[in-house]
């Protein structure tokens, strides 16, 4: 192992360089300490260095911020594999493997598994939402949500209307990346009625595809943080719903 004290730009100007893989983890902080997301703003500028990196190696791996957009990754590296990595349902990084084996998008939940699909692959839309049908709610792992793979992953296992929403299943699905809860009831979101019924109670509030933050929902409904109830809020089409979980 050779340790080189030089900037990437300076080092890549050297002659005779050739590597099997290049791994880049650009500095994502500005001179003033501000967090950076755009790859072109990071140091070194991997986008500007791409032509030289291609000469030095046919394989490039770039570690990006968890906020980095998958679509932007594929725009910058069209033939790459893009992997969204999560741990404990928290997105940790977006990794680009620019080695000509793509395009492919992968969601990896560490300790749970992975799921891959080609960009643009779609799942058939589910039918009309019928709250009486469903016995289980699926919360797709955040890696699926970030990679926009939730609908494809749950196809045939649960009905889901958006990559940012919940899945609804008649029977408990197996082999899904995410958490599954038995449903007690699904009902229209009626804040006045809910507040009359639930004010002062402890609850865990979950939400996806819903315009209010969990904290704001708790405030409006008079709830306190706790394990007494588990409520999930979502929007499907033009309608808002609350799901009581067992």
What are these regions (language model features)?
Residues 1-246:
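SAM-dependent transferase fold signal centered on methyltransferase-like domains
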């Amino acid at each position: 192992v050779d340790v080189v004290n030089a900037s990437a730009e300076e080092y890549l100007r050297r002659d005779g360089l050739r590597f099997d893989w290049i791994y880049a983890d650009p500095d994502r902080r500005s001179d003033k300490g501000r967090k950076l997301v755009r790859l072109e703003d990071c140091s070194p500028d991997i986008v500007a260095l791409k032509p030289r990196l291609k000469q030095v190696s046919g394989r490039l791996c770039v570690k990006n911020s968890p906020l980095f957009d998958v679509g932007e990754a594929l725009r910058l590296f069209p033939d790459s594999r893009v992997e969204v990595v999560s741990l404990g349902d928290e997105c940790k990084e977006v990794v680009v493997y620019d080695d000509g084996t793509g395009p492919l998008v992968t969601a990896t939940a560490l300790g749970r598994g992975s799921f891959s699909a080609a960009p643009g692959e779609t799942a058939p839309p589910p039918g009309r939402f019928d709250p009486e049908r469903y016995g289980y709610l699926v919360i797709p792992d955040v890696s699926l949500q970030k990679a926009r793979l939730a609908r494809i992953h749950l196809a045939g296992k649960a009905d889901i209307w958006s990559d940012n929403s919940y899945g609804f299943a008649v029977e408990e699905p197996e082999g899904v990346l995410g958490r599954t809860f038995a449903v007690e009831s699904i009902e229209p979101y009626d804040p006045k009625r809910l507040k009359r019924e639930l004010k002062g109670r402890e609850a865990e509030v979950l939400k996806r595809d819903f315009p209010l933050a969990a904290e704001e929902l708790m405030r409006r409904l008079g709830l306190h943080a706790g394990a007494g109830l588990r409520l999930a809020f979502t929007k499907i089409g033009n309608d808002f719903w609350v799901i009581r979980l067992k």
